[in-house]
């Protein structure tokens, strides 16, 4: 069963064609990878799937609902697109508490659990501005998972992590898959994609050039 279906997708911004007739399905319960150089269109495709950008042509359905028609932003989805933005003078926990308050249905236990699952100490008082890049990336993932979504959309989840951090993140993402989650990863690293993903989709100049798996 497909959780994401992309049909004949085109995206043109200021007379520049960003995506060209992209056709791809992503099966539920698997880890899928998008790989390509800067400017290949992979991040723009993810933003279209998330509902952040409306495509010029084509149809995207997520969990059976058409994005932009039946639903503006797909529900039950955790997202990290580019660098997560946090309030620099708040702790990681306080940032997540603020976001949880805006969403209105996430308790302290869910926040603590999401931070601990990605290797962050929820009692740490350090301001986010003093976090390493890797710690901010982990905090972004904690934000994405704190509502226990079925689908995760992750742009460069390994960015800023050291060797041990990358290994831990890979193990954690694989454990999410084992628990029935679907994950779509965008990465420059072919190694991360090859190790983690059941399917690998390569993009170049807005065109889907190769699909493996």
Predicted regions and their residues:
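Conserved ABC ATPase "signature" region
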Residues: 97, 108-123
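Catalytic Walker B motif of ABC-type/P-loop ATPase nucleotide-binding domains
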Residues: 152-156
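Conserved ABC transporter NBD signature motif
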Residues: 58-73
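Helix-to-loop junction immediately C-terminal to a conserved catalytic motif
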Residues: 50
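The feature captures the beta-strand-to-loop junction immediately N-terminal to the Walker
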Residues: 35-37
């Amino acid at each position: 069963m497909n959780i994401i279906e992309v049909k004949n997708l085109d995206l043109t911004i200021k007379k520049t064609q960003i995506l060209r007739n992209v056709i791809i399905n992503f099966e539920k319960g698997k880890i899928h990878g998008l790989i390509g150089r800067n400017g290949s269109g992979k991040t723009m495709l993810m933003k279209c799937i998330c509902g952040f950008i409306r495509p010029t042509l084509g149809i995207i359905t997520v969990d059976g609902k058409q994005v932009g028609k039946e639903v503006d932003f797909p529900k039950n989805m955790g997202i990290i697109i580019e660098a997560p933005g946090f309030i620099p003078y708040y702790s990681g926990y306080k940032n997540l508490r603020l976001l949880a308050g805006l969403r209105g249905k996430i308790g302290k236990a869910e926040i603590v659990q999401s931070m601990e699952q990605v290797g962050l100490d929820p009692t740490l008082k350090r301001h986010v501005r003093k976090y390493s890049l890797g710690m901010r990336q982990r905090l972004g993932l904690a934000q994405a998972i704190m509502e226990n979504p079925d689908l995760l959309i992750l742009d460069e989840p390994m960015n800023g992590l050291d060797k041990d951090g990358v290994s831990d993140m890979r193990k954690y993402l694989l454990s999410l898959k084992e628990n029935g989650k679907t994950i779509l990863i965008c990465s420059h690293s072919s190694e991360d994609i090859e190790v983690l993903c059941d399917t690998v989709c390569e993009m170049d100049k807005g065109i889907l050039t190769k699909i493996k798996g």
